[in-house]
Amino acid sequence: MTKRALITGITGQDGSYLAELLLDEGYEVIGMVRRSSTVTFERIAHLQDRIATVNGDLLDQASLIELLRTYRPHEVYNLAAQSFVQTSFSQPVLTGEVTGLGVTRLLDAIRLVDPDIRFYQASSSEMFGKVHEVPQLETTPFHPRSPYGVAKVYGHWITLNYRESYDLFACSGILFNHESPRRGLEFVTRKISHAVAKIKLGQADELRLGNLDAQRDWGFAGDYVEAMWLMLQQDQPDDYVVATGETHSVREFCELAFGRVDLDWEQYVKVDEKFFRPAEVDLLVGSPAKAKRQLDWEPKTSFPELVHMMVDADLALLQGDLDHLAR
């Protein structure tokens, strides 16, 4: 029997890598997109003849019920969200509606249509925010420091609530920062790699950033989607931290990125206070011990490999290599 999977947020970074993985595993893949959305399909352009894209909206439960009834997926991966932390401060209500309540609408649609569907919720390290312990575990208390983090906490707890209340196979992956050449330009890692390529090619002469001392646990998105899939292949539903267990600063990212093209980052990077967050999170670093123990998962891509991959891809992009996103 061919398994069918529904991915919300399929046009995003994680959705595109997850779609590739599921296709390789022999799945039929259905991607949900919003009819009103202005999102680009470039991340899945190389897959579009192998997947079905259908209309649905996390703000509209009737559309979710109809979608589940029509396509009868065995697994649902909820990756759709208003996912940019900075935007969540200017659009807190929309962030709550999509990133928080949208999870409830999807879970309730599953409960009504087919409670045997296995559900994955994309939780986030931003839920920890003002951290209570280092490294962060599945049991670490949440103290979110942005409307995005607050909405993700709601989505996380409602997933657990539906698991316990209705016996749904519902899992949350608490993913720490994960990057790739497909990362949006609004995220600091891609902002850096893209600027490095532009500076190297003579198309820019400086890069303005916020807090260079901000530290994150950065991994490769292509590695992390494997953990999502593995969660739904287990005998019992559970929640897992997905991380590298290492922390690096924005400054380190700059050093490696500029170093890749033989430039001194300090000559080009300018600190601009407008890029500082209203409330900065503390030291986010996750322990992937449980995922390693129970899922037999661990990251394959090192931090320097990730940075170099992103710089190389942006150089290729700016030099007209349109196949860079399929990598």
Q: What do the PLM-derived regions correspond to, one by one?
A:
Residues 46, 55, 172, 211, ...:
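Structural signal for conserved beta-strand scaffold positions within catalytic alpha/beta enzyme cores
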Residues 59, 90, 98-101, 146, ...:
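Residue-level signal for the nucleotide or nucleotide-sugar donor/cofactor binding architecture
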Residues 293:
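Alpha-helical residues within the helix-turn-helix
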Residues 1-178, 222, 232, 301, ...:
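N-terminal Rossmann-like NAD(P)+-binding domain of SDR-like oxidoreductases, especially those catalyzing
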Residues 207, 211, 238-240, 248-255, ...:
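C-terminal "lid/loop" region of Rossmann-like NAD(P)-dependent oxidoreductases
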Residues 131-135, 145-147, 153, 157-233, ...:
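NAD(P)-dependent short-chain dehydrogenase/reductase
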Residues 139, 204, 237-239:
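Short, solvent-exposed beta-strand edge segments and adjacent coil->beta transition regions
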